[in-house]
Amino acid sequence: DVYKRQYMLIHSNFLKKGKTSAAPAAAGVKSQSTEDIIINLRDEVCRTMESATKIYDRTLIAVFKENRKVLRDMVKESNDLFYQSRERKYTLLPTLKKLQSSDVNTAHYYVQVVDYLNEMTKALMHITRPAFEHIDNNHEGLSKEQAKDLMSINDDVESIYRHINQMLRDGDFSEIEMVLTLRDQLFESIAEAIKSELSRINEARSNTKASMLYLTILTETKNMVLQSRNLLKSQQYFLKHRTGPQKWIK
């Protein structure tokens, strides 16, 4: 269909761009100081997390309202976010060589941060695409029960991401255990929502296509938050091993 052709075109263009830009990007890394690498990664992590927060929230609201245009925009934005995080892997090796020359531990955590960033944006993309395809194909929207559960989960995700984004911006990780507690509470809510949906399916009280979308959103939300928390933890270690306690933004 049209959407798949558009996606393949975007994907193809990205791969071509990656192949042509990898060499110049690698050359650029050689001229960067270790401090430059840290600052650039910090900025990318903050920017990506803040964008992901907005995309997730707007996607769920657009699903509730069956707003095809907004969902299409969210697919594009999540695609861009994912491919930007993947593109960093083209400069991974020269960056590692640069970091390992001064600190092997820093290089190790850099790899983790890049990987978790990629996995988090991938999970987000696995929410926006099915959501758009569902509405674009004129399938039945979510039920009131499904929408209510997702609105509650959306609020929980927003709370977690607000704390994560604040810690990333301030460079103050003192609330990281609270985020872990909020994450565990969210996962319990997701587990309960899945059980409730399976009961509705067994009782034939739920539309099949809507149920598939709903369960996909729940599963990928869990993946997204899990990777985000891992990302936060690795970013904390990354900074700790390289620079010690400090504020990121003066």
Predicted regions and their residues:
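Cytosolic, long alpha-helical scaffolding segments
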Residues: D1-K250
